[in-house]
Structures are given as C-alpha cells and as structure tokens.
C-alpha cells in the first residue's frame, strides 16, 4: 500500500497549505559554505533537536504531500483538470446540440418570418457549414481570423500534437483541435502554421527537468517522456525522479541513517517527526528519544497498558480504532485491545508526545529541520521562536521549497537532504550501513492439541447434535464453514464428494483433492457378532487425471488385535490398512484418529491418517510459523509416506500452519527477492511446546538512491547457491546425480511405483512396531526406518523384499545403507531447537553494494523446559539471557502438557481406547455466531454481525446494565450517529447461550462431576478430557492412598474394566500373582508436593521402581494421623511417555523425623513461593519500574523456588545481541491511552495481578491443575472456555514472543 492509500483514509479538509510551490537550488559554492557552517554548528551545539518531514523519505520512493509530485499536489491538479474537462465537455456538447439544430434553408425560405428573427451573432461552425453547403465543400480556410499567440503559453505543431496524443493516450483536445477536425478531409491548409496550445503541460510545473536532470543511476529522460510522467507512479525530488514503491518495502535513506547514528553517539538528543513510515525505527528503536506526533502506520497501541508494537505489516485502521490484535504482555490471557495510532484531521496530538516535544524544544539550542515546509500546526510551533523554541536557539532548514519558518531561521539550504547527510556521515565517521531483517518465529506442538487454533480455521455455526445423532448421519464437514447453510441432525447431506483446489499466495492452483465422508463398522477381536456403533470419518483421496482406478471397494477394515493378555503372540496378525487408489500417494482412511473442521474448505486440515503401524511410527506434528515478510513456501517429500501440509492462515500477519510427519525442508521466499532454507525438526517423543525465533537479513542499504527496483517481479535468473534439490542436507544424504529423481513428484512412473509399494511399506512398518524395544535409544526419525538392523530374522526377510522395490528411488543403495531418506542425519545436539537455518542457506536479495557479512542469520530466542534438562550443560547459555514467563503462562503450560501428551505406551495387553476430542466437542456444543476468540479478525467479525435495529444510543455503563447478552462499549464518539458498536469479550463474562438444566444434569451424572469443580461453572458447554497418567511421574509428585493400607503399584499393568455401577482398574503385578481392584473415586490419586492446601491427615506414598518385589510384600498399614513422605533424588531419565523416575530409597520404611523435617521445609518454601510468584506476576505490570538486568537476575535466583509447584518449568532464552524495547519493562504513567475499548471498571488492577481477569483465570487454572494431578485416572468434563484456552496456548505463546520483540 502506497502513501496514496493512507491519504485516502483521511477525512476531507479543504485547507492543506500551499501546494506545488516553486523549488529553489543553491549554487555549488554557496552550498559548500552553508554546509561547512552547518557542520561547525553541529559540533559546537550541546542540545540538538531534529524536526523531520516527508521530504527525507522521497529518495526512498515515498511520496511527499506538497512537492511537485506530492499527494495533495496531485489531488489538486487532478481536481483542476477534471473541472476544466467538465466545463469543456459541457460547452462542446452545447455547441454540438446547436449545430445539429441548424437547418440550412433554401431561397424560398428566406421570406419566412423566422428568418428575420435570427440572432445577429452566429457561431463560426454555422458559418463553415453554410459555406460548405453553397460552395460544395470548397471552403477557403485562409478566410478565418488569425489566431493570437500568447507569449506565456506553450504551443506545438499539429503533427507533433497528434503523435503525442497517440503515444500518451491523452485525448484532452482543445477548441482549436476540434475546429480543425471538423473541417474534413478536403483540406489544403498549411498544417505547420496551426499552433495548438498545450493544456496542463508538466513543463509549466517543472520547466527544467529534462535539461538539468542528473544522469547518475538514472535512465535518460526524453522530452516526451517527461511530459508523459504519471505523477502517481513517480516521485520527483529536486532534479531526480524515482518510481513509487510500497510503504512496507521502503528502505531507510542516508538521512535516516545519519539521524540514527547521531542519536547513538548522543549528539542528537531528541527527534520530532511528522512521518508515518516508521523508517526511523527501522534503523533502530529509540522510543524515548522520538516523538511521532502524527502517528505511525505500522504501530499498534494497547488500550489497556499503553505499550506500542512496531509491526512489519500496515495497520488498516485510522483514528485510534481497534485493529483486531490483542496485547499479550500486559495480561495472560490477553485482554488489552490494540488500536492504531494514526491521527486524522480532527484528532489532537497525543499528550505524551506533545508534552515531550514542547519540553525538548524549549531546552534545545539547535533546531535541525529536514525535509518539511512546516505548514501544519502545531508541528510548526515546536521549532518556531514565536511559540516554543528558545529565542537564543539556532535553527537550520534543509528543503527545496520555501518553508513557513523561512523568515525566522538562521540558515536556509535549498539542496538535496541526502547529499548533505552523506557529507555529515563522512565528517563524523558514522556507519552508513542499514540492515533490514526479518524475524521468523516457529512453534512446534503435538498435532492433537490444535483442534481450535483460530476462527479462520474453525468456525462452527448452528450445529445442534445430541448424543446419538452425531454418529448416525453422514455430515459434510467441509461445508460447515458456510454461514448461509444450516446443518442439523434431521437433514442428510446430498453431496458426498467435495473437490477442493489448493492455491498459493499468488493465486496459482497447485493441487486438486476430493474428500468423502465414510462410515466404518468396527469389529473388535475379529468377532463379527459384536461391533461398535458407526463412526463417521473424513476420508481423503488425491485424484489424478492419468489414473482412474477405483479401489475403494477393496479396502480392508482396521481390526484391533489387542486382547487382554494374549496380544503378545499376535503381533504379526495386524491387517494392512487400505491404500485406496494406485495413483494416490497419501490416500488414507481412519477410524480412531482426530479430524479437524475448517471454516472455509480447508482440506489441509480435514484429513485423518490411517491407523497402520507406519502411521504410528510417523505421527504428525504441527508447526505454526509467523512472519509477515514471507511471500511463498515450497517443499518436497522424500518418501511416499511422508506428508507435508502447508496452509496460509493470515495473509496480513503472515501466519502459516504446517503439518508434517517427518523432518522437512522449506524453501521460503521473502521480500526483496531473498530466499532461505528452513528445516523443521520432527520429534515425536517431545510433548512440549517448543519455540524458536530466527533473525534473517533480507536487505542491505547504504541509503543510496537506487531507482526503479522492482520488488515484486520474480527474477528467474536469481543466482542463489542452494535450492530444495541441492543443499547441505541433500549433498550429505545422496549423490547429486540422483537428487532430481528423488524429488520428481510429478513423474507418473514414480507415483505409480509408489502406490504399488504402499502395502509393502505398511508391512515393514508393522514389523518395526513389533520390535521398538530395540530402538528406544535411537534418534527421533530413526524409528521410521523400514530396514532396521535390530529386527528379528523374520522381519529382516520382509525388509529385504522391500529393498528391491525401494531401489526405484535410489539405485545405489547397498546393504550398509538401508535407512529411509530423511534430513535427521545432521541434527544438532541442541534438543531445544525445533528448526534450523544455516548461514549458507540464506540469500539476501537486495544488496546493491555486494556487502558480505560474517553472519546473515542467528537464533533470536528459544523456549526451553528446565525440568527436562540441566541448563548448566547448555553450551550456548552464555550467549542467551533468561526471561521468565508469568506464572499464569507457566500454569497453563503445565495443564497443556498434562492433557495433550501422547500416550505412547506400547502395552499389547491394554485396549486402545480411542477418543475424538473434536467429535465430542461438536456434539455437545451449540455455538453462537459471536463466539470468536483471539484471532486477527475477531473484532471485524463481531462488528459485522452486530445488529443495531432500533436500538437507542446510550453510554457504556447504561448499556452494560440493560443488555446482559454482551459486554460492549460505544465507539470513540458516542454522540455521532452511524458508528458501529464494538463488542468486547462475552467469553469471560459468561454470556453464552445456556443449555437446559436437564442436559447438564445428565452429563454430570454420566461423568460424575461435582459442583465444586471449576469446569461446570458456566453450566453450558462441557468437554471430555482424559488425563495422561504417564506425565505424573515426576520428582515433585507423590502417590496418595486414602485407605488404611498401601499397595506397591510398581511394574503393574492397568486395565480399565467397565461395569454398570462404576469403573474399576485392575492392577496386575509383574508375575500375575495378585489382583487388586481399586475404586476410581476414593483410592487412586496424586498431588504435587508443594501446594498451599496440604492437610496434616494426608497420607503420602512414594512411587518407586523395584523389579524384585511384589505388591503383597510392600503393604503397610497406617493411621489417619500418620504422615509419610519420601523425596526422590535420582536424576531424571530422558523424557517419554513411559519413563519413570528412580529413587535412592528402595522402601517406604523411613524414619518419621526425616519426613517431618521435609514437611517443614516444604511449608517454608510454600511461603517463599507465594512472595516470589507475586513478584513474578508483577513483572509485566505497568507500575513495575525494574530494569532488564535486575529483573533477569532476580528471576535467575528465584527460578527454582518459583517452579517447584509445577511439573514443567518453561523459560524463554533471548539472544544477548538483541535488546528488548523500552516499553517491555517500564511504561511512563502519562502514556496511558484513553479508556475506550477496554472495560477498566470491570477489569481493575491489583498488586499481584495486572487485572482481575488474570487473577480469575489463574485461580481457575490452578484449581484445574490441582484436580488433574490429584485424580490422575479420572475422566473430566472441562468447560468449553477452559478447553479453548488450553488449545490456544501454542498460538498464545507465538504471539507472546512476537509481541515481546516488536514492543518499542
């Protein structure tokens, strides 16, 4: 978007100052004298304040406002041109009407009375027609009156004018041209004698452009070309011209670099700018030394805390309206609504910047004014000695045109600002280099945790389903996003097959898919008599035109061969899953997996993988990537069972959703023709949310005026030393001669061979799953190998059969290289890296001076879990500083990990109970259309859905009392009519549509939910969640039994046995000698060790791992008043789903003195934790005035104590090269914005929490966390709001880190 788009947002204002004034140019000798005086004044001044305008950005390709090709100047010229054209067309049409009414009379009509009543004066056209009538078109044009040639007008010959009109498509013909064209073809006049006046000639504005143009780095401009310049596409500054570029692609000029370097050297104390292009901040962030009095088109401001964020994308609103973003630093969960900071004509200056500008203007002894005419008030008042400037101060103005302050300034220089800035840079030995970098933030999380990622993905409207209707009807989920269609359980969907086209960001269709809903009957234990009710599954097929083979009827059903105790002997009886079409690489059908529903037809997320062993080995993971500078992403697959799905969720913010089941490489195209290779590391054994932030250079500039650089044209001749087929990973994996064959996915032979080998691949992977015990210590993707050397002999035979088939891709494979193709061979040892960008895989597109830095990319930050590894062993820890997250973020992080960890226990004796979260989520939920949460467009969607009707206008508090169905406030102007009403969160105000109490009571009875639990608070939506029991095995977690006896449950297998009355868990020891049933309600619980609600009558039992003892030998009877507690001290093993923690103590018969001593220490630590949590929650509070270093030191000292109450301890590590913004830790009190969109009275502040919402959510999350830990084997019904908050955590963390780096 150019500056013209910004100017069109402004309201109409007639007076904009003088437009298109004459420009002046200094002589060379006089300019040298003035520049020398300027440099001496800069050296001698003590307090310099810079006043900058739009003139310093014209060399960057941005238009000014009052220059020769300024925005307002072009508007004024266009208005005059249109006005003249309308007047000319009106007169011309009037003449034509009169000429058509003229009837040439015969001599017999001359006696009529009408002939004598004609006017004496006739038009010349009538005379010509009359002469042509009588003289038979032989008219002497020399009889016409001679034309008067005005000395001040510009005339051209007729032929030249016709040539110019044909070349320029400019049909502004004047009256003389119309007269000549009306003569006809029988014309014998001298055309050279006819002079035609040039209307709106550009030479009248700039007469010397074609004569005195500077030819350095500029194409030669012809006279005709200068006359044909489109002022909206080119900007003219001085004697130069440059093509207009977009605002987000503009690079800093030499003037911006000079100001930034002088601020770094403390020569310039303060800067007051009228520009909205943020080029000053692109050089470096100096919020406390900069006053943007007119706002910034890239900046958002939180309406709750006042923090400002510098975005890489343009803000679409003006006059402090909500943008759709939320502030993640002032509160977690986010509560602050972000607005723009652009001023309209009717808006006054922000008080913070206005007071700062007055303060520094009064102190300054030198006012350095650059590129502004100062016709806007009060911007012109700051350097004026008649207003705020000191009377004894010195002032200098550098501008081509005369300014409003020309009469009172001490030094006027009419010259190019960049030329003078270049001299200053050399005199003060400044660094002229400016680096434009892109920040790429990546989050990796398990696939089943993003059922509800954002409303652009999932929006469910008018879905009313009861208990059994969900599984009885075929529903086309791909059409649920359409708001105009309503689905219920009484209607069948007529369209069973839906074709979806995939388009990239440039609008090119690159893939076609069709989706179908399938109904499968599931027969457990190979018994055809019993079957589970029908399950609706989304079935994905990729159809290719060259193959029309239909093998859908030959699909094999998935059979569970898992019996209670006899499945160990039936490992090889697993049936192969279906590969539905010979042309389909990724065809799949599922029974037990999760599926996703999208608002639009998003087939990338509407798929279910099959339950074959190959899929279990290659489970998928989700990567969320955000970077507004990304243009396109490309990738390839190494094997047929590798899957990569890429979807652009938000085009403005650059939010990408990537789902894959292997480590893949992405070729990412950025702005300025820059390219990178991004490697996404797949690690299925990692249940945590991991984050990496990278800083990549995309452009280098020295402020040179490089003209007409096309940022959008894709140059095919760009020479980058890497691509998807030739890079460091590929060269280490294969020879270059076979790389192209590996990635030729469009080859029909490869596809057909791949589809024919799918069954063999499934068989081999089944064999691998039966022997995973030998491969536990391998790398993540080494479990994907079909040819595993540790397999049994029977499996080796099967694998050898597949080697010959797999040689289609690679002919030079031998027995020593039997692994599948992957990128994990060069993985780094840093397990906290979920991605990788090498310096060799970065191509900087805009580098006119061929600058070669040592490092073009570096990791900016990463999120690590301290509980899983020792931080002292981190080699790169010295280059990073710790930034502790808030307690509410840590608490939600722990809940997320507990609930969403994949249960990878490979116990063949247990029945795999499938659970589809989204299935139950849809079945029990009835969404309102206004339930849009945490998305970029949620405000706009709510505004569009708002129905005003005949609703009277009244203020916020009256509206809150009278209407209870929403939580809203009026817009900025309550008195103006026609304003849209902004609806605030109805999420936290419990304003959802309520269900009937009978349905809720049935759910409570079914799932045994108590009234004290937090998840039945709202009593409208519930969600079923099963706690991952394997996550509770931690050193701060203990087993508790509320009976009078203790049982050793080590090395026992749990089997859930369904009964009519209650659920029982059968505990078998290792030798199957004893069997004990424990009630789920009373006996089996676990709680964290450090909690405030520890009761004295609690009975603790330590979980230990002893392979030699049985359960009957370790039974101890204790009284209610006895207290047993055992501390675990052995180091933690590598984390996975069934790791357990050993202990130094092999029995529970410890002395009571030591136990009481440990109890007292825990109670003391609890008190300390309360104070530390209080300090940590105040970290992001507005009243917190701590510095960066002090805060980090305190967090480092108190980190261990603060996190003892949680299982996991996430910490963000930030590279020391990057300095966080000033507003991250400290916000001046007078920066507070107006209280318009955030309900301050409802959400007040206190000392411990930033607002009451954070306190409320923290308390509810705390209660939920305690319930999950205390009852590990219990199935819970969680409120829909809490479930959405848990599902949104990866998206929240992504935005939290992004706001952390964009904060000014």
Curated annotation (Swiss-Prot):
Region described as Disordered: 545-585, 749-827, 1154-1203
Cofactor: Zn(2+)
Catalytic residues, chain numbering: 294
Cofactor: binding comment: Binds 1 zinc ion per subunit.
Domain Deacetylase sirtuin-type per the UniProt entry, residue ranges: 28-466
EC nos: 2.3.1.286
Sequence positions that bind NAD(+): 53-72, 274-277, 371-373, 399-401, 417
Catalytic activity: N(6)-acetyl-L-lysyl-[protein] + NAD(+) + H2O = 2''-O-acetyl-ADP-D-ribose + nicotinamide + L-lysyl-[protein]
Pfam families named among the record's database cross-references: SIR2 (PF02146)
MF annotations from Gene Ontology: metal ion binding; NAD+ binding; NAD-dependent protein lysine deacetylase activity
Keyword field: Metal-binding, NAD, Transferase, Zinc
Signal peptide: none
InterPro entries: DHS-like_NAD/FAD-binding_dom (IPR029035), Sirtuin (IPR003000), Ssirtuin_cat_dom (IPR026590)
Top-level division of the source organism's lineage: Eukaryota
Ranges of biased composition (kind: Low complexity): 548-585, 756-806, 1182-1203
Main EC class the enzyme belongs to: transferase
Biological process (GO), any one: regulation of DNA-templated transcription
General function of this protein: Regulates the expression of the surface antigen-coding var genes central to the malaria pathogenesis. Cooperates with Sir2A to mediate silencing and mutual exclusive expression of only 1 of the 60 subtelomeric var genes at a time, coding for functionally different but epitopically variant versions of the erythrocyte membrane protein 1 (PfEMP1) molecule, to evade the detection by host immune surveillance.
Family designation: Belongs to the sirtuin family. Class IV subfamily.
Protein name, per record: NAD-dependent protein deacetylase Sir2B
Organism: Plasmodium falciparum (isolate 3D7)
């Amino acid at each position: 978007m150019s500056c013209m788009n910004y100017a069109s947002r402004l309201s109409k204002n007639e007076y904009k100052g003088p437009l298109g004034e004459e420009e002046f140019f200094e002589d060379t000798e006089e300019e040298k004298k003035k520049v020398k005086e300027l440099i001496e004044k800069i050296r001698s001044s003590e307090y310099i304040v810079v006043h900058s305008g739009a003139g310093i950005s014209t060399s960057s390709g941005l238009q000014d406002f009052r220059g020769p090709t300024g925005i307002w100047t072009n508007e004024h010229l266009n208005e005059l041109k249109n006005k003249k054209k309308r007047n000319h067309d009106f007169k011309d049409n009037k003449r034509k009407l009169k000429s058509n009414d003229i009837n040439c009379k015969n001599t017999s009509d001359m006696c009529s009375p009408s002939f004598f009543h004609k006017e004496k004066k006739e038009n010349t056209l009538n005379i010509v027609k009359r002469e042509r009538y009588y003289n038979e078109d032989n008219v002497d044009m020399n009889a016409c009156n001679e034309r008067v040639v005005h000395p001040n007008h510009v005339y051209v010959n007729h032929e030249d004018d016709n040539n110019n009109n044909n070349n320029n498509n400019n049909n502004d013909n004047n009256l003389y041209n119309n007269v000549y064209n009306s003569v006809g073809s029988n014309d014998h006049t001298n055309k050279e004698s006819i002079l035609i006046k040039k209307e709106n000639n550009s030479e009248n504005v700039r007469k010397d452009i074609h004569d005195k143009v500077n030819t350095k780095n500029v194409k030669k401009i012809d006279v005709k070309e200068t006359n044909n310049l489109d002022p909206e596409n080119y900007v003219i500054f001085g004697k130069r011209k440059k093509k207009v570029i977009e605002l987000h692609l503009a690079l800093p000029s030499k003037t911006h670099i000079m100001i930034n370097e002088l601020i770094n050297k403390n020569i310039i104390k303060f800067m007051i700018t009228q520009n909205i292009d943020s080029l000053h901040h692109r050089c470096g962030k100096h919020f406390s030394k900069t006053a943007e009095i007119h706002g910034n088109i890239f900046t958002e401001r939180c309406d709750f805390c006042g923090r400002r964020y510098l975005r890489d994308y343009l803000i679409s609103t003006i006059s402090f309206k909500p943008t759709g973003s939320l502030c993640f630093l002032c509160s977690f969960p986010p509560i602050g609504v972000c607005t723009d900071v652009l001023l309209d004509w009717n808006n006054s200056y922000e008080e913070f910047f206005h007071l700062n500008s007055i303060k520094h203007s009064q102190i300054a002894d030198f006012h350095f004014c650059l590129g502004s005419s100062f016709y806007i008030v009060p911007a012109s008042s700051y350097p004026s000695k008649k207003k705020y400037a000191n009377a004894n101060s010195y002032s200098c103005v550098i501008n081509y045109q005369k300014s409003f302050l020309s009469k009172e300034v001490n030094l006027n220089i009419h010259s190019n600002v960049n030329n003078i800035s270049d001299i200053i840079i050399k005199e003060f030995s400044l660094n002229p280099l400016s680096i434009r970098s892109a920040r790429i933030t990546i989050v990796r999380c398990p696939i089943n945790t993003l059922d509800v990622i954002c409303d652009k993905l999932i929006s469910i409207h008018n879905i009313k389903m009861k208990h059994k209707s969900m599984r009885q009807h075929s529903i086309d989920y791909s059409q649920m996003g359409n708001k105009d269609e309503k689905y219920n359980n009484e209607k069948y969907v007529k369209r069973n097959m839906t074709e979806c086209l995939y388009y990239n960001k440039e609008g090119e269709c690159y893939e076609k898919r069709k989706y179908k809903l399938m109904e499968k009957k599931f027969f457990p234990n190979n018994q055809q008599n019993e079957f589970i009710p029908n399950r609706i599954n989304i079935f994905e097929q990729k159809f290719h035109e060259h193959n029309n083979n239909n093998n859908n009827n030959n699909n094999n059903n998935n059979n569970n061969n898992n019996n209670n105790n006899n499945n160990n002997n039936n490992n090889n009886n697993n049936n192969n899953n279906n590969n539905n079409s010979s042309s389909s690489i990724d065809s799949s059908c599922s029974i037990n997996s999760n599926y996703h529903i999208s608002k639009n037809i998003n087939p990338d997320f509407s798929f279910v993988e099959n339950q074959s062993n190959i899929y279990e080995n290659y489970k998928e993971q989700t990567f969320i990537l955000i970077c507004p500078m990304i243009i396109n992403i490309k990738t390839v697959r190494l094997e047929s069972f590798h899957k990569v799905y890429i979807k652009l969720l938000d085009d403005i913010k650059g939010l990408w959703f990537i789902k894959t089941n292997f480590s893949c490489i992405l070729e990412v195209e950025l702005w300025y023709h820059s390219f990178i290779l991004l490697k996404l590391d797949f690690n299925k054994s990692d249940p945590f949310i991991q984050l990496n932030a990278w800083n990549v250079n995309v452009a280098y500039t020295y402020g040179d005026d490089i003209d007409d650089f096309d940022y959008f044209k894709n140059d095919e001749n760009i020479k980058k030393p890497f691509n998807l087929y030739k890079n460091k990973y590929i060269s280490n994996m294969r020879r270059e001669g076979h790389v192209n064959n590996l990635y030729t996915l469009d080859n029909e032979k490869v596809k057909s061979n791949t589809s024919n080998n799918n069954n063999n691949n499934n068989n081999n992977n089944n064999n691998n799953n039966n022997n995973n015990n030998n491969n536990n210590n391998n790398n993540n993707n080494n479990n994907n190998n079909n040819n595993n050397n540790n397999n049994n002999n029977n499996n080796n035979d099967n694998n050898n059969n597949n080697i010959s088939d797999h040689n289609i891709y690679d002919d030079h494979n031998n027995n020593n290289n039997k692994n599948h193709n992957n990128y994990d061979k060069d993985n780094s040892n840093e397990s906290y890296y979920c991605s990788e960008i090498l310096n060799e895989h970065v191509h900087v597109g805009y580098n006119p001076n061929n600058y070669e830095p040592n490092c073009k990319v570096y990791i900016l930050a990463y999120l690590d879990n301290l509980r899983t590894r020792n931080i002292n062993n981190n080699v790169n820890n010295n280059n990073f500083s710790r930034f502790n997250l808030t307690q509410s973020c840590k608490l939600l992080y722990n809940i997320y990990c507990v609930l969403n960890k994949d249960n990878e226990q490979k116990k063949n004796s247990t029945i795999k109970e499938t659970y589809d979260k989204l299935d139950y989520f849809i079945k029990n939920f009835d969404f309102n259309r206004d339930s849009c949460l945490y998305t970029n467009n949620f405000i706009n969607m709510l505004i569009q859905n708002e129905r005003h009707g005949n609703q009277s206008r009244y203020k916020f508090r009256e509206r809150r009392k009278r209407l209870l169905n929403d939580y809203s406030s009026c817009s900025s102007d309550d008195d103006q009519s026609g304003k849209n009403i902004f609806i605030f969160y109805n999420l936290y105000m419990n304003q959802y549509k309520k269900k009937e109490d009978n349905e809720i009571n049935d759910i409570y009875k079914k799932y045994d939910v108590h009234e004290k639990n937090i998840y039945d608070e709202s009593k409208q939506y519930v969600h079923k969640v099963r706690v991952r029991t394997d996550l509770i095995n931690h050193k701060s977690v203990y087993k508790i039994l509320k009976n009078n006896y203790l049982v050793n449950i080590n090395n026992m297998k749990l089997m859930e046995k369904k009964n009519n009355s209650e659920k029982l868990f059968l505990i078998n020891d290792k030798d199957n000698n004893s069997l004990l049933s424990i009630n789920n309600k009373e006996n089996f619980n676990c709680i964290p060790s450090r909690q405030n609600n520890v009761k004295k009558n609690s009975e603790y039992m330590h979980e230990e791992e002893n392979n030699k003892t049985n359960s009957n030998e370790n039974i101890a009877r204790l009284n209610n008043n006895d207290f047993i507690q055992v501390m675990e001290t052995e180091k933690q093993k590598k984390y996975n789903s069934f790791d357990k923690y050993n202990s130094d103590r092999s029995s529970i018969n410890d002395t009571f003195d030591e136990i009481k001593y440990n109890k007292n220490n825990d109670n003391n630590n609890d008190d300390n934790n309360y104070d530390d949590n209080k300090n940590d929650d105040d970290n992001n509070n507005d009243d917190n005035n701590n510095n960066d270093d002090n805060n980090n030191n305190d967090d480092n000292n108190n980190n261990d104590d603060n996190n003892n109450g949680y299982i996991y301890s996430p910490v963000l590590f930030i590279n020391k090269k990057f300095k966080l913004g000033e507003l991250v830790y400290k916000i001046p009190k007078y920066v507070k914005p107006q209280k318009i969109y955030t309900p301050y009275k409802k959400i007040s502040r206190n000392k411990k929490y930033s607002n009451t919402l954070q306190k409320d959510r923290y308390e509810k999350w705390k209660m939920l966390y305690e319930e999950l830990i205390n009852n590990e084997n219990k199935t819970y019904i969680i409120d829909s709001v809490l479930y959405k908050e848990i599902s949104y955590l990866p998206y929240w963390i992504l935005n939290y880190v992004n706001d952390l780096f964009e904060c000014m």
